[in-house]
């Protein structure tokens, strides 16, 4: 059997075939072993048969009745087995024919869909051409009427493409009339009014026709071929009714494939009517004949196998009889042999029965599956027919719009009323495409829509006076998509949902009856479910199919007639069975004789002996081949069912998206009917509304097109977009409302690439995302591409609350910069296997910034590598600001973040969640780069910051009065981690960046918790101490006066520390007004404590200049204000800070062998800055570490060992 899996088959199916072959190899070895065992049993049976014949030869009268009874039972058993085998062969033949017919029909439907897409694309391009302004070389005197006529012609062509082939003859008259209408509509208006054409009554009657019968043909003359198949538990009755003109031989060939009814049926009848549809042709008939020819050799093979099995069964029965007779006469010498033979015989029968039951259950399952798919295809055909009828009605209505109004039919109808009629037809089309079970929910919506149509046909003065609102319920109900896209045609029909799930090594099938029925009916429905079998090899595939009441009385009558015809055939088969049984008996006797002669080495019968043994071996091989062939057929059916299921799933998704697009188009048409309101019109005219309609049509085409057509349609979409922009350029276009994406669709997607972080202004760059998932590692690459290749910026992942911030920014700039407090969600979790990092950087960028971003994330096994590179910013806007007026500086409110409280009992891996808040002002565009490495048990973090260039002179020429910015520092509470057993818990670094007009420094905190260490971080904000109050409200250039914090280092208590690695932090040069960094590093290696403190030369003038520095600062501010008023170029502010008093940590340790010191290094800073100081400490292998920052004090504690990093920035005056 050759099965075509359709266009969706892939390499996965091939891998499944290989897996099945691998699984069948052990079964082959097992079958070989069973063959050897059976061979031994056969030898014993032959001996038993010989003894039985000898007993019969000597005419033992005492066992004559027993022999007759045994032969009678043997005859009955053979008859039942033959009937069962014939029934299974017929069922397989029937399913093969059914699968081939379904495959051909699916191919034709795909071709129709492709042609329909091409026609819809042509229609869309024509509508786009209507929107574009007329050019001198393309107008050619055509007016709007002629273009609409061309559009109607394309719509007629689309209808023809969607219609079946055999409808062309019936629609010839309709096409001729349509062509005449088009010609009349394209003529001048004077000629049209002179020659008024009548609308044919036939077309109006066809619009009102609705087909209630779900199985009726599309047209009265269209032939149908109905297949009525009834499946019972052990009986299959199939009726093939050919309603076409054909010869008697063809009908007889169709009937020949029908099976013989079985007598043991016990389940309720499950009827299925299969409509071959109008798409079948003579090619399908040829395929059926070819299948019949191929099946004839298989029938001969089955007969031969039956003969062999009959001989084997007779031998087994004789052996059983001999064993019973020997047991009766108590032959002690062969008692053990008799018991073993009986036990083996019982086991053999049980295994064979179990195998037959398993195969029967699998066949029953596939029967149900094919049955449900056939019903679903029938319902889809009915939906297609109804859609064609509705499209024909809509086409006729459009033709009526093109025809000139007649005095007897106009009756005061204007364009508004005709549009209302079109909306009604569109609503009817949407109802046809929607499932039937939504009709009850949409009744209120339909009533409201009817009222709107009546209101829209009223005069415009009345409409403006009584403005109607669209109810929210109707909009919500329009967005509802029914998961059961294959419901019955009417809402009163019941639904039967069959949920079948295929797993790797088992098949679970469930039949759910969703109607009110008795318990017996539900139990009968469940009885057809199969037992889980071990031969399934496909992956998890879920399928929901619907069963509808499709049977009829005519099909039942056909079944009875076929049964009457098959009774003579059954009698003939029984007679053949009796003849074969007699031949089998003679063959068995010959086999017994041959074995006995071989035992006594009779040379005269040597040839006969060899032939009998050869036949025995051939029988075993044929049986094994038959089993393998059945397994192959089952596998092919499984592959076919899975491919059809994938195709149906994709079609359902396309249908759902098409319904959503049709709902949007219907709402747009309803908006055209509503009266124009003063706050919504905004200068919109008919051309702009048509442009919006074309956009919705393009969206519908994209939804209906398959995924592989996206690349082909890119150029078409670009041209369409350009045409829409050109057509809407002369007019004022309204702001388009962004559509909300439903949460269900976002949850179903594994990776959702949304455009929520698009550029706020035209200067923002484009970003491309490339994500690769592998088996045990995740490599994520975020590549930032833009016009400026030199600069890179961090990836912006906008949170959900960004829209609120954007709305606040649109209202206007906020004068003071106040910081808000926001608490992150608490994440309680008991068991996490792997928690991967999430980088969230909410950007707040101004229009003058041009930044680009690139981030690389990699998580491999136990390694996490994260790089954040924020490119520097160019100052190209300085010259523009000289020409423009003084713009107010935006004041933003930063969030105070409270880290999540993580409650966790067992965490295997908890990776970091870095969050960065970036806020840049007009004059500050720093370059920032961060690199996170979490590799095995190490955490590295580096912060690199470039120099911040400031062009204050240019800004102060245009903005003499620079407002001072007052900021409140962020209060950050680091996450409290409560954990019993942590394998690896990586840190959660959080960086807050806020740069005012003169530039603020960075703050960084790094901590790590490795193996079984517990980390607690406490961040203390910077404390500003400005003793002097600002006298003036707006000095030209504020000078900052800061006092450094006094930091007291904690005591470190440790008994045994082998190694403690700390995280270094690098500090680079800062501009004049920026605060410096301080870094400290601690190292203890092997039981050694290294402490190095390098203090630069501290001039003794520091203490004396403390108080004088404050006074001088106030004087310099006043002096700078006066100078700024004169020349508007104040000097750069100098920062005067107070030195920090540092208490060195007290280290208590029992066993410290060595203490290594690390020399400190000094970095040169600009004129107003002092030296940097760095202290370096290191601990290794049972670590103690502590981190304290000037801006952010962070404490880290670990379970048995601690990790400490101390960061401190100190300014030493020279």
UniProtKB/Swiss-Prot annotation:
<feature type="region of interest" description="Disordered">
    <location>
        <begin position="433"/>
        <end position="471"/>
    </location>
</feature>
<dbReference type="GO" id="GO:0005737">
    <property type="term" value="C:cytoplasm"/>
</dbReference>
<keyword id="KW-0175">Coiled coil</keyword>
<feature type="region of interest" description="Disordered">
    <location>
        <begin position="162"/>
        <end position="200"/>
    </location>
</feature>
<feature type="compositionally biased region" description="Acidic residues">
    <location>
        <begin position="165"/>
        <end position="177"/>
    </location>
</feature>
<feature type="domain" description="Olduvai 8">
    <location>
        <begin position="1116"/>
        <end position="1214"/>
    </location>
</feature>
<feature type="domain" description="Olduvai 1">
    <location>
        <begin position="165"/>
        <end position="259"/>
    </location>
</feature>
<feature type="compositionally biased region" description="Basic residues">
    <location>
        <begin position="1102"/>
        <end position="1121"/>
    </location>
</feature>
<feature type="coiled-coil region">
    <location>
        <begin position="610"/>
        <end position="670"/>
    </location>
</feature>
<feature type="domain" description="Olduvai 5">
    <location>
        <begin position="891"/>
        <end position="946"/>
    </location>
</feature>
<dbReference type="Pfam" id="PF06758">
    <property type="entry name" value="Olduvai"/>
</dbReference>
<feature type="compositionally biased region" description="Basic and acidic residues">
    <location>
        <begin position="190"/>
        <end position="200"/>
    </location>
</feature>
<keyword id="KW-0963">Cytoplasm</keyword>
<keyword id="KW-0677">Repeat</keyword>
<feature type="region of interest" description="Disordered">
    <location>
        <begin position="722"/>
        <end position="746"/>
    </location>
</feature>
<feature type="domain" description="Olduvai 7">
    <location>
        <begin position="1041"/>
        <end position="1114"/>
    </location>
</feature>
<feature type="region of interest" description="Disordered">
    <location>
        <begin position="1102"/>
        <end position="1136"/>
    </location>
</feature>
<feature type="compositionally biased region" description="Acidic residues">
    <location>
        <begin position="801"/>
        <end position="810"/>
    </location>
</feature>
<feature type="domain" description="Olduvai 4">
    <location>
        <begin position="800"/>
        <end position="888"/>
    </location>
</feature>
<feature type="compositionally biased region" description="Acidic residues">
    <location>
        <begin position="436"/>
        <end position="448"/>
    </location>
</feature>
<feature type="coiled-coil region">
    <location>
        <begin position="70"/>
        <end position="128"/>
    </location>
</feature>
<comment type="similarity">
    <text>Belongs to the NBPF family.</text>
</comment>
<feature type="compositionally biased region" description="Acidic residues">
    <location>
        <begin position="821"/>
        <end position="833"/>
    </location>
</feature>
<feature type="compositionally biased region" description="Basic and acidic residues">
    <location>
        <begin position="461"/>
        <end position="471"/>
    </location>
</feature>
<feature type="region of interest" description="Disordered">
    <location>
        <begin position="791"/>
        <end position="837"/>
    </location>
</feature>
<dbReference type="InterPro" id="IPR055306">
    <property type="entry name" value="NBPF"/>
</dbReference>
<feature type="domain" description="Olduvai 6">
    <location>
        <begin position="947"/>
        <end position="1038"/>
    </location>
</feature>
<dbReference type="InterPro" id="IPR010630">
    <property type="entry name" value="Olduvai_dom"/>
</dbReference>
<feature type="domain" description="Olduvai 2">
    <location>
        <begin position="436"/>
        <end position="530"/>
    </location>
</feature>
<feature type="domain" description="Olduvai 3">
    <location>
        <begin position="707"/>
        <end position="799"/>
    </location>
</feature>
<feature type="coiled-coil region">
    <location>
        <begin position="292"/>
        <end position="399"/>
    </location>
</feature>
<protein>
    <recommendedName>
        <fullName>NBPF family member NBPF1</fullName>
    </recommendedName>
</protein>
């Amino acid at each position: 059997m050759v099965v075509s899996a359709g266009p969706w088959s892939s390499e996965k199916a091939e891998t499944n075939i290989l897996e099945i072959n691998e699984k069948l190899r052990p079964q082959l070895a097992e079958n070989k072993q069973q063959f050897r065992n059976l061979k031994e049993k056969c030898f014993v049976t032959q001996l038993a048969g010989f003894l039985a014949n000898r007993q019969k030869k000597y005419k033992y009268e005492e066992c004559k009745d027993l022999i007759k009874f045994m032969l009678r039972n043997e005859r009955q058993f053979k008859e039942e087995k033959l009937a069962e085998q014939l029934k299974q062969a017929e069922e397989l033949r029937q399913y093969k024919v059914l699968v081939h017919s379904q495959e051909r029909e699916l191919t034709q439907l795909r071709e129709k869909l492709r042609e329909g897409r091409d026609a819809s694309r042509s229609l869309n391009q024509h509508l786009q051409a209507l929107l574009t302004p007329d050019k001198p070389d393309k107008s050619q005197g055509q007016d709007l009427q002629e273009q609409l006529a061309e559009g109607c012609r394309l719509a007629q062509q689309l209808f023809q493409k969607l219609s079946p082939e055999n409808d062309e003859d019936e629609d010839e008259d309709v096409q001729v009339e349509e062509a005449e209408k088009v010609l009349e509509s394209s003529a001048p208006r004077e000629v049209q009014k002179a020659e008024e054409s009548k609308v044919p009554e036939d077309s109006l009657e066809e619009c009102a026709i609705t087909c209630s019968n779900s199985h009726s043909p599309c047209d009265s003359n269209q032939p149908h071929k109905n297949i009525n198949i009834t499946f019972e538990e052990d009986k299959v009755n199939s009726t093939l009714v050919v309603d076409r003109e054909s010869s008697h031989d063809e009908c007889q060939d169709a009937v020949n494939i029908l099976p013989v009814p079985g007598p043991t049926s016990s389940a309720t009848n499950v009827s299925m009517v299969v409509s071959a549809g109008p798409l079948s042709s003579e090619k399908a008939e040829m395929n059926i004949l070819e299948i019949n020819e191929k099946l004839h050799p298989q029938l001969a093979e089955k007969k031969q196998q039956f003969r062999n099995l009959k001989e084997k069964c007779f031998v087994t029965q004789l052996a059983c009889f001999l064993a019973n007779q020997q047991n009766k006469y108590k032959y002690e010498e062969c008692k053990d042999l008799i018991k073993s033979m009986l036990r083996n015989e019982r086991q053999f029968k049980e295994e064979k029965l179990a195998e037959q039951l398993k195969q029967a259950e699998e066949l029953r399952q596939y029967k149900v599956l094919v049955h449900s798919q056939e019903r679903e295809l029938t319902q889809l055909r009915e939906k297609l027919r109804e859609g064609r009828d509705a499209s024909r009605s809509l086409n006729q209505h459009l033709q009526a719009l093109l025809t000139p109004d007649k005095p007897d039919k106009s009756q005061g109808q204007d364009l508004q009323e005709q549009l209302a009629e079109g909306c009604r037809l569109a609503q009817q089309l949407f109802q046809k495409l929607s499932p039937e079970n939504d009709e009850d929910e949409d009744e209120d919506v339909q009533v409201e829509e009817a009222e709107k149509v009546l209101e829209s046909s009223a005069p415009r003065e009345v409409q403006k006076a009584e403005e109607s609102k669209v109810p929210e319920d109707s909009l919500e109900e329009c967005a509802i998509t029914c998961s059961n896209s294959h419901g019955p045609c009417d809402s009163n029909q019941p639904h039967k949902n069959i949920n079948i799930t295929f797993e790797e090594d088992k098949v679970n099938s469930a039949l759910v009856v969703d109607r009110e029925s008795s318990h017996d009916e539900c139990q009968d429905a469940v009885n057809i479910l199969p037992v889980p079998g071990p031969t399934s090899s496909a992956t998890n595939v879920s399928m929901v199919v619907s069963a509808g009441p499709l049977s009829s009385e005519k099909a039942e009558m056909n079944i009875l007639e076929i049964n009457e015809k098959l009774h003579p055939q059954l009698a003939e088969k029984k007679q053949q069975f009796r003849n074969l049984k007699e031949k089998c008996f003679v063959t068995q006797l010959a086999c017994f004789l041959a074995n006995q002669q071989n035992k006594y080495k009779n040379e005269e019968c040597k040839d006969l002996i060899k032939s009998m043994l050869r036949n025995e071996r051939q029988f075993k091989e044929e049986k094994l081949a038959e089993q393998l062939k059945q397994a192959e057929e089952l596998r092919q059916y499984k592959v076919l069912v899975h491919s059809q299921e994938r195709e149906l799933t994709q079609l359902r998704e396309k249908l759902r998206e098409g319904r959503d697009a049709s709902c949007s188009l219907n709402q747009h048409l309803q908006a055209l009917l509503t009266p124009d309101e003063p706050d919504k019109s905004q200068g919109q005219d008919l051309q702009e509304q048509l442009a919006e309609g074309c956009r919705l049509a393009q969206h519908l085409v994209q939804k209906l097109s398959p995924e592989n057509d996206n690349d082909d349609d890119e150029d078409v979409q670009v041209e369409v977009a350009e045409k829409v922009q050109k057509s809407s350029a002369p007019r004022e276009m309204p702001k388009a409302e962004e559509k909300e994406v439903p949460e269900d669709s976002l949850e179903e997607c594994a990776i959702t690439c949304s455009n929520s972080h698009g550029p706020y202004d035209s200067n923002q760059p484009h970003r491309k995302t490339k994500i690769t998932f592998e088996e045990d590692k995740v490599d994520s690459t975020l590549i930032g591409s833009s016009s400026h290749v030199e600069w890179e910026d961090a990836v912006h992942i906008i949170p959900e609350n960004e829209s609120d911030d954007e709305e606040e920014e649109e209202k206007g700039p906020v004068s003071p910069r106040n910081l808000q407090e926001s608490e992150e969600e608490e994440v309680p979790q008991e068991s996490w296997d792997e928690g991967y990092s999430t980088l969230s950087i909410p950007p707040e960028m101004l229009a003058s910034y041009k930044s680009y971003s690139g981030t690389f994330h990699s998580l491999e096994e136990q390694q996490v590598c994260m790089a954040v590179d924020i490119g520097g910013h160019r100052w190209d806007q300085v010259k523009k600001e000289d020409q423009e007026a003084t713009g107010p500086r935006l004041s933003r409110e930063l969030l105070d973040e409270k880290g999540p409280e993580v409650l966790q009992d067992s965490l295997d891996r908890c990776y970091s969640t870095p969050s960065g808040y970036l806020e840049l002002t007009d004059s500050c565009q720093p370059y920032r780069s961060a690199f996170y490495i979490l590799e095995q048990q190490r955490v590295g973090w580096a912060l690199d910051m470039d120099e911040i260039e400031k062009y204050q002179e240019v800004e102060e020429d245009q903005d003499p009065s620079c407002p001072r910015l007052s900021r409140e520092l962020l209060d950050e509470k680091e996450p409290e981690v409560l954990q019993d057993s942590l394998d690896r818990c990586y840190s959660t670094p959080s960086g807050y960046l806020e740069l005012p007009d003169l530039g603020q420094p960075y703050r960084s905190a790094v901590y790590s918790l490795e193996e079984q260490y517990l980390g607690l971080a406490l961040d203390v904000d910077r404390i500003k101490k400005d003793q002097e109050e600002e006298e003036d409200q707006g000095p030209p250039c504020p000078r900052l006066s800061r006092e450094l914090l006094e930091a007291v280092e904690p005591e470190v208590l440790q008994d045994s520390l082998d190694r403690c690695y700390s995280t270094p932090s690098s500090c680079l040069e800062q501009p004049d007004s920026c605060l410096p960094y301080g870094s400290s590093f601690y190292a203890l290696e092997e039981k050694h404590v290294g402490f190095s403190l390098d203090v630069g030369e501290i001039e003794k003038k520091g203490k004396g200049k403390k108080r004088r520095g404050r006074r001088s600062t106030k004087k310099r501010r006043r002096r700078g204000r006066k100078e700024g008023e004169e020349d508007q170029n104040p000097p750069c502010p100098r920062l005067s800070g107070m030195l920090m008093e540092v208490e060195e940590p007290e280290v208590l340790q029992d066993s410290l062998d060595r203490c290594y010191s690390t020399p400190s290094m000094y970095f040169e800073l600009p004129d107003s800055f002092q030296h940097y100081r760095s202290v370096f400490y290191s601990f290794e292998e049972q670590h103690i570490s502590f981190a304290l920052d000037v801006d952010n004090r962070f404490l880290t504690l670990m379970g048995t060992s601690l990790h400490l990093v101390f960061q401190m920035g100190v300014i030493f005056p020279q």
